[in-house]
Amino acid sequence: MAWQGLLLAACLLVLPSTMADCLSGCSLCAVKTQDGPKPINPLICSLECQAALQPAEEWERCQGLLSFLAPLSLGLEGKEDLESKAALEEPSSELVKYMGPFLKELEKNRFLLSTPAEETSLSRSLVEKLRSLPGRLGEETESELMGDAQQNDGAMEAAALDSSVEDPKEQVKRYGGFLRKYPKRSSEVAGEGDGDRDKVGHEDLYKRYGGFLRRIRPKLKWDNQKRYGGFLRRQFKVVTRSQEDPNAYYEELFDV
């Protein structure tokens, strides 16, 4: 009776595992063949796997498909393992590059050390160096970035100064003779006193208007007949009565 109970318990324990294997295999086969001309029915496949149905055509097809897919899955797993190993080795190789000098120093001093106190002091110094290593790397990158930013700022400031301060030759090319005829107004404010300011203003007026001020004389007196006549002759080409020929006047009267 004891042996029969043990066999029954073993069968009950094995049955769920075999059922789970059949279900997983048949479901995988059904997924792979669902777009094909003859898809595998997962229910019939699982029953044939458990030897509940005969003949086991669906299960045999599924076994052939699983045997074909097994090497492919193994190859993909191998590729994933290699990629994961490479991804893990990359940071380790970078760490070895930075830690190489410290490790060499440790190997050299290992043969020279004789007391455990020296070994502990060396290990502490090595740990401190390793802790400060990421900070140094961050500071180096930050200093490089700051240097690039300062260079860019300097270039921008130099460009701004060049644009604000133009060469006089460039001004002459751009404006031509305009600067020679009409000088800058800053010369009007150059004098310190009132007299200097008036003098500078007169000079600017003479430079700006040229002979116009010499041709039109502002100090003509109208009470003088000679000057009045000369002014009319110069400006309006009018001849005064005193300068006309009297005979011409009489001739006009006789003609009327």
Curated annotation (Swiss-Prot):
GO terms for cellular component: axon terminus; dendrite; extracellular region; neuronal cell body; plasma membrane. InterPro entries: Opioid_neupept, Proenkphlin_B. PROSITE patterns: OPIOIDS_PRECURSOR (PS01252). It holds the Pfam family Opiods_neuropep. GO terms for molecular function: opioid peptide activity. GO terms for biological process: chemical synaptic transmission; neuropeptide signaling pathway; sensory perception. It is found in: Secreted. It comes from the Eukaryota. Residues 21-172, 186-206 form a propeptide. Keywords: Cleavage on pair of basic residues, Disulfide bond, Endorphin, Neuropeptide, Neurotransmitter, Opioid peptide, Secreted, Signal. Residues 1-20 form the signal peptide. The N-terminal domain contains 6 conserved cysteines thought to be involved in disulfide bonding and/or processing. Leu-enkephalins compete with and mimic the effects of opiate drugs. They play a role in a number of physiologic functions, including pain perception and responses to stress. Belongs to the opioid neuropeptide precursor family. PANTHER family: PROENKEPHALIN, PROENKEPHALIN-B. This is Proenkephalin-B. The gene is PDYN.
